[in-house]
Amino acid sequence: MASMIALLTWALALLPALASAQTQKGFWDYFSQSSGDKGKAEQVQRQKLAWEPTSLKDSLEQDLSNIDKFLEKLGPLSGQAREPPALPQDPADMRRQLQEELVEVRARLEPYMAEAHEQVGWNLESLRRQLKPYTAELMEQVALRVQELQEQLRVVGEGTKAQLLGGVDEARGLLRELQNLVAHHTGRVQALFHPYAQRLVSGIGRHVQELHRSVAPHAVASPARLSRCVQTLSRKLTLKAKALHARIQQNLDQLREELSAFAGARADGAVEGTSQDPQVLSQEVRQRLQAFRQDTFLQIADFTRAMDQETEEVQLQLAPPPPGHSAFAPEFLQADSGKALSKLQARLEDLWEDINYSLHDHGLGHQEEP
């Protein structure tokens, strides 16, 4: 019953939390119209806020009856049972009385909602902890491969320094060899990153499935919506992991092209008799490698932040926080009313699905007391 309590609390609290007074008014007008004068179809059409009225009207009376029965079961929460109050026929009085009743009901139900939010959040934090070693391993590999490349592409040594400062043919030969080394070693590093990227992808799939099993007892969402949310999370994180791997490969391609072009330009300069400074060559290689390292680290950090954002969004979808929580409906408090309304509609559609599941499929009369 705790999941149904959380659903009801969220439903009752959502409208007062909205920044848009017009959105609140539209919902109440639609509620009043649906339960009062159902003959004015054209007025309902203007006030429905893009919801399909047919499906709502077909199930409204039965759902309200079920909710009345459910409210009767809330009596033990306050230590005494009471009959649900009769709703007045006047829409304004109905709205006022409902709001007064809901303030009291919400205060009693919020603890259950907060508990579900915390339990789901704990499981999502566990997912983030489980995936952290994969990204840490990627960063370690980037640092290690950069260090290896720096050693393998070193052009200043006991033998190479004399070649660069010697004749044209010796300098050009060394620079052409550097181009070949760049192509060989960057290609080898690209191959080495494949298994690490694959481990990240497979780890996402495995740990998200574990999340599905662990979060199911605490989520207020219906099983079908829970499954969709988890599958969407898995798909998004997998796509982001593959995109990260592709960017690392692109970074290595760019590194190879830049170093090869630099060595080629130096080789052409040697043909023209330009003096080649070994220190300049070594410094260029170091700078390019450090730029690759820094860019790749930033991209891995971006992936980690995106993972955090996606899991936080899933937490809001599966177990919204209580209305007093700072994270409650933050996206509605924005200037873009069209975007806010779209998010509100999606959130209410999810809520309606969950309530229908709890009232009909789950069986209201068979719920256990919290």
From Swiss-Prot:
Signal peptide limits: 1-21
GO cellular component: chylomicron; early endosome; extracellular vesicle; Golgi apparatus; high-density lipoprotein particle; late endosome; very-low-density lipoprotein particle
Subcellular location(s) per record: Secreted; Early endosome; Late endosome; Golgi apparatus, trans-Golgi network
Parts forming coiled coils: none
Pfam family for this entry, one: Apolipoprotein
Principal location class: secreted
Gene3D superfamilies assigned: Apolipoprotein (1.20.120.20)
Record note on quaternary structure: Interacts with GPIHBP1. Interacts with SORL1; this interaction leads to APOA5 internalization and sorting either to lysosomes and degradation, or to the trans-Golgi network.
Keywords on record: Chylomicron, Endosome, Golgi apparatus, HDL, Lipid transport, Phosphoprotein, Secreted, Signal, Transport, VLDL
Primary role: Minor apolipoprotein mainly associated with HDL and to a lesser extent with VLDL. May also be associated with chylomicrons. Important determinant of plasma triglyceride (TG) levels by both being a potent stimulator of apo-CII lipoprotein lipase (LPL) TG hydrolysis and an inhibitor of the hepatic VLDL-TG production rate (without affecting the VLDL-apoB production rate). Activates poorly lecithin:cholesterol acyltransferase (LCAT) and does not enhance efflux of cholesterol from macrophages. Binds heparin.
InterPro entries noted in UniProt: ApoA_E (IPR000074), Apolipoprotein_A1/A4/E (IPR050163)
Record GO terms (molecular function): cholesterol transfer activity; phosphatidylcholine-sterol O-acyltransferase activator activity; phospholipid binding
Protein family (similarity comment): Belongs to the apolipoprotein A1/A4/E family.
Protein name (Swiss-Prot/TrEMBL): Apolipoprotein A-V
GO BP of this protein: acylglycerol homeostasis; cholesterol efflux; cholesterol metabolic process; lipoprotein metabolic process; phospholipid efflux
Residues modified as Phosphoserine: S59
